[in-house]
């Protein structure tokens, strides 16, 4: 299952027509998958590559990596992690979405990709890691914020029950209201994960007219409270 920045990039390509006009494609230097050691072994075998697994005393979230040479002669690395930082493996696995990647030769490759909303949570969680406050990480975070409403619009166009999309909005609310990294991003960088909310005329009127304003008001109240706490500490 594809996770990390490459999942954000794949979703950006898949949902391009649902994203704001002019939004630049996001890239990723890494190709990360969620998987156990057996998955790493299988990948190395299928690709004719080399297998690397952490030693017992290695402090790493990786379960291993497969290094192989692609069809153009370039060495590539696939990193496998037990779970994305800040997320739970079983939840990521349960909510992953199957897509098909169109190849230049006309083939379509099936691929499981981390859910767009979990991509957002992953990008937010990563901001707490050393070395993850880079310009590239910021672009990936900004892109992930836009992916969630884009995915919601896609679901509505596909005729999916609007309640699925309102649940996405509730997940965004939970992230903005309770996640300490999301709060820090708002306070320190002005990054608002509530921009991932979708207000669409196809959603129930009660959700648009009542629930969304409630969400914004409750998060604003919590942010004001946090600012006041910080200010009092500064005065002390």
Regions found by a protein language model. Give the residues of each.
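Compositionally biased terminal segments of proteins
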Residues: 1-236
């Amino acid at each position: 299952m594809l996770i990390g920045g490459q999942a954000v990039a794949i979703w950006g390509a898949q949902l391009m027509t649902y994203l704001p006009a002019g939004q630049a494609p996001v890239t990723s230097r890494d190709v990360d998958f969620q998987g156990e050691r057996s998955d790493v072994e299988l990948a190395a075998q299928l690709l004719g590559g080399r297998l690397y697994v952490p030693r017992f005393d290695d402090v790493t979230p990786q379960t291993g990596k497969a290094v192989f040479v692609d069809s153009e002669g370039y060495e590539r690395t696939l990193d496998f992690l037990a779970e994305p930082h800040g997320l739970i493996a079983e939840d990521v696995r349960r909510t992953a979405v199957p897509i098909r990647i169109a190849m230049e030769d006309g083939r379509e490759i099936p691929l499981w990709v981390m859910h767009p909303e979990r991509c957002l949570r992953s990008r937010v969680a990563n901001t707490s890691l050393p070395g993850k406050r880079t310009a590239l990480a910021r672009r990936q975070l900004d892109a992930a914020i836009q992916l969630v409403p884009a995915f919601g619009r896609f679901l509505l166009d596909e005729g999916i029950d609007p309640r699925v999309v309102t649940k996405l909005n509730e997940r965004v609310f939970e992230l903005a209201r309770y996640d300490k990294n999301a709060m820090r991003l708002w306070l320190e960088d002005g990054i608002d994960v509530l921009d991932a909310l979708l207000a669409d005329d196809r959603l129930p009127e009660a959700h648009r007219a009542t629930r969304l304003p409630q969400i914004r008001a409750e998060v604003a109240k919590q942010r004001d409270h946090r600012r006041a706490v910080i200010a009092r500490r500064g005065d002390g």
